[in-house]
Amino acid sequence: MRILISNDDGVNSPGLAALYAALADYTECVVIAPDQDKSGASSSLTLDRPLHPQTLANGFISLNGTPTDCVHLGIHGLLEREPEMVVSGINLGANLGDDVLYSGTVAAALEGRFLQRPSFAFSFLSRQPDNLATAAHYARLLVEAHEQFDLPPRTVLNVNIPNLPLEHIRGIQLTRLGHRARAAAPVKVVDPRGRAGYWIAAAGDVEDGGAGTDFHAVVQGYVSITPLQLDRTYQDGFSSLNNWLEGRR
């Protein structure tokens, strides 16, 4: 099996290196990752300029694009042999609850699944690499076990690993996405020439983080696994809309 590895922290991220090291002695791996940090890129594709891959000294391929670009090109002809799986991460920072809407890490996995490859997104609950070996351990464990899952064909597994030594992890929990409150307002700044600018502020506080959510699992010391689907259709919305449409047909 050939695995395509990508991320949104960039090709020089220690999380990417740890993921590659964990998987490369299990199976063949190729890395295509953004040439700079693309956190928050979501599923964006680069359409306003050409993409230029560059092979680095360590064999990783750096691309001047988004995580989704990396996976799209990796499956659509950049490689001599197409990968059979996509693994994204290890992100330095959580992708919990509503974070998945913005995450380039999750988006890379979604693109892989959209292009009919089993896909994982792995995130580690720290910006520092101190317990990164724990995340790498669970990435290897789940990738090796993927054929036993029997998942629906348009499903991605979003995995978040606590910042703990391996021996302190309490286990693995299957979870749903929690939810955050509204994000803080952007922060206005003024440059030396008097021009206004804005920094996007931090994500909102956890609003729905009770038992059964990904937020709750990681706080309790568990690895959280949340199945995500590509189809975002909200079936429960049909009935109320149908009632409104009945008299207008």
From Swiss-Prot:
Source superkingdom: Bacteria
Keywords: Cytoplasm, Hydrolase, Metal-binding, Nucleotide-binding
A GO term from the CC aspect: cytoplasm
Entry note: cofactor: Binds 1 divalent metal cation per subunit.
Primary location group: cytoplasm
This enzyme's EC code(s): 3.1.3.5
Gene3D superfamilies: Survival protein SurE-like phosphatase/nucleotidase
Enzyme class (EC, first level): hydrolase
Localization in the cell: Cytoplasm
Listed cofactors: a divalent metal cation
Keyword Cytoplasm: yes
Binding site for a divalent metal cation: D8, D9, S39, N91
HAMAP family given in the database record: SurE (MF_00060)
Function: Nucleotidase that shows phosphatase activity on nucleoside 5'-monophosphates.
Record's protein name: 5'-nucleotidase SurE
